[in-house]
């Protein structure tokens, strides 16, 4: 290229145009035949004056050099074509060696050194964790109070408003079990630790810092692992989930309280329930990283944020699992499906009251909007319908369970149509609006419903 620029600088315009025409023709397949003038190939060009004799030899040398460059490029291209299949094959091998080889290996996987820190939503009763003391909550004097916080992205601010108003009313219970999915996974540790962290949640969901999470990769994202960069989400979680938070979660776990987070194993297509208190109380040096990785995975919308790779082992072989948004499997983490499906295996209440509080960070009612007949709007609209129906089914299952067992059912959801755009997913005005909605409805006494209401 340097040679090209130097030579062109030494040529008069007429000769440069002739050479460029020759190069353009060769590059794009329009090569003049011997004796054919450039204007015969490119008839729209003006007649060019003949080049002067003084620069003829330089132009000839330049043409020879350019032809050599073209031959080099052609040879390099052919070499790449020959090598590409081998490169792709090697790349494929590198990507699959450290992953589960089949469903059997994936289902038998565990996190080395941690014991029973996870189970599956679809686990059979005989597959339930054997260490019951580390999983079952210890009932308090007033029975068991369980808080379940759903997914919903920016709608998580609704939960924050509810919790803030609940604390202000001084009626917020000390929850024995807290579960979180997706954005609910980010809220759950603070809801678990109590009202002292309301201001932290307020800052996280209404200050505008959530808008930093939207950093695109540009066109590259369409062919990579995600549209948005993972860095901002990971950095935010590392900033708010500190060693001090881990120690406090561990202390509450030792008191018999339980914190559960849901992720989705994309390879096995199974919803994974993580015992976050057991992880925090493990004493392992990598416990904080695993804790943060699980929260990141649960909040990572597939395709929007990259999945999180978590190290596991099965039968002595070590590999990585790909975990992503828990909301892909369920918008709300409730009881194992085996309990919900069979009344003959319901755990005894032993005379203790059980309260299920479910906060849905989304609207359950239909929301009318004219959908543009374009690819992305149609996909997004269909996805929102899927989320609604999935949540409605989960709530119906839990409600039926409470009717069989005598437990009490309480559900809160966004029941007003707040303007929202999926092209501006963490809009601060939207987050503040749903925060205020949750707060105001709690104060007004209209928040909780004793059965699912979908219209």
Question: Residue spans of the language-model regions?
Answer:
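Patatin-like phospholipase
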Residues: 94-177, 192-455
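Gly/Ala-rich beta-loop-alpha elbow adjacent to hydrolase catalytic centers
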Residues: 179-184
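Residue-level signal for mature regions of secreted extracellular proteins and peptides
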Residues: 7, 86-87
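Sec-dependent N-terminal signal peptides
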Residues: 74-85
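N-terminal secretory signal peptides that target proteins for export/translocation
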Residues: 1-4, 8-14, 22-75
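C-terminal motif of bacterial Sec signal peptides marking the signal peptidase cleavage site
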Residues: 89-92
């Amino acid at each position: 290229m340097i040679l090209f620029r130097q030579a062109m600088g030494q040529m008069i315009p007429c000769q440069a145009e002739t050479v460029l025409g020759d190069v353009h023709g060769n590059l794009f397949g329009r090569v003049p035949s011997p004796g054919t003038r450039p204007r015969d190939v490119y008839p729209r060009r003006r007649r060019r004056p003949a080049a002067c004799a003084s620069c003829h030899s330089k132009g000839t040398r330049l043409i020879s050099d350019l032809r050599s460059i073209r031959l080099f490029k052609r040879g390099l291209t052919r070499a790449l074509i020959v090598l590409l299949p081998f490169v792709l094959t090697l790349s494929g091998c590198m990507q699959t060696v450290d992953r589960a080889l089949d469903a059997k290996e994936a289902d038998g996987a565990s996190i080395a050194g941690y014991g029973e820190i996870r189970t599956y939503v679809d686990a059979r009763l005989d597959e339930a964790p054997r260490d019951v003391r580390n999983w079952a909550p210890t009932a308090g004097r007033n029975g068991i109070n369980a808080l379940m916080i759903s997914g919903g992205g920016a709608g998580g601010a609704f939960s924050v408003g509810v919790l803030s108003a609940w604390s202000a009313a001084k009626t917020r219970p000390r929850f024995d079990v807290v579960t979180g999915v997706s954005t609910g996974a980010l809220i759950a540790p603070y809801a678990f630790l109590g009202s002292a962290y309301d201001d932290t949640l307020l800052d996280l969901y209404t200050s505008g810092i959530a808008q930093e999470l939207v950093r695109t990769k540009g066109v590259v994202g369409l062919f990579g692992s995600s549209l948005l960069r993972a860095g901002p989400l990971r950095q935010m979680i590392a900033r708010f989930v500190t060693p001090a938070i881990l120690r406090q979660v561990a202390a509450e776990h030792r008191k018999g309280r339980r914190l559960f987070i849901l992720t989705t194993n994309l390879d096995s297509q199974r919803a994974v329930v993580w015992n976050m208190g057991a992880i925090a109380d493990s004493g392992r040096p990598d416990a904080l990283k695993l804790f943060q990785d699980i929260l990141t995975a649960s909040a990572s919308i597939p395709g929007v944020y990259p999945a999180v790779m978590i190290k596991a082992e099965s039968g002595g072989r070590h590999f990585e699992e790909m975990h992503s948004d828990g909301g892909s499997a369920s918008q709300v983490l409730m009881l194992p499906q085996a309990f919900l499906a069979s009344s003959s295996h319901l755990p005894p209440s032993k005379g203790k009251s059980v309260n299920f509080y479910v906060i849905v960070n989304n609207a359950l009612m239909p929301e009318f909007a004219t959908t543009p007949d374009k690819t992305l709007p149609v996909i997004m609209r269909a996805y929102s319908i899927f989320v609604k129906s999935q949540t409605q089914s989960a709530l119906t299952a839990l409600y039926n369970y409470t009717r069989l067992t005598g437990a009490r059912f309480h559900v809160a959801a966004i029941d007003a149509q707040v303007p929202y755009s999926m092209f501006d997913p963490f809009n601060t005005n939207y987050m503040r609006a749903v925060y205020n909605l949750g707060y105001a409805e709690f104060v007004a006494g209209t928040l909780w419903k004793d059965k699912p209401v979908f219209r």
